[in-house]
C-alpha cells in the first residue's frame, strides 16, 4: 500500500471494503463512452458483483453508449451520493472494460441482476458487464478531500 497525505492507493485483486460497501449501497451509475471524438453518458441501473469486481447492467444494442462501446471497450463512470453537506460527500469514479458476458459469467450476472431488479424479467434487453480496472473514491467523512484509490494489476488480465 502507498500512502500520502490525501490519497490511499491500493493495488490488489479487489477493492477495500469501504469502496465495495459504497458501491453496493447504490443502484444507479453514470457510464461514459466515446467513439471518434464523440463522448456520451448514460445512467444505468446496476448490480455490483464484488467477488468479480464488476458492474452488471442491461441495455439495448441500439443505444448510443452500447453502439460506442462496440467500437471502444474502454469506459469510465461514476456513482455519487447526492448531498448538500460537504462533510458527507461520497462518490466513486471508475474505469473499466465493457463486454457481454458469456456462458457461466452470463448466467451469474443475469441471476444477480434479476435478483436486484426482478422487473427486468419483463423486458427484452441485454446483459452487459464492466470489469473494473481503476477506482477513485472520495469520502469526506474520512476528512475533507480524502481519496481511496484502487487499481487492478493489468498484468492479471493478460
Q: What residues fall within each predicted segment?
A:
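Alpha-helix boundary recognition
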Residues: 23-24, 70-71, 114
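Extreme N-terminal tail/first-helix region
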Residues: 2-28, 155-158
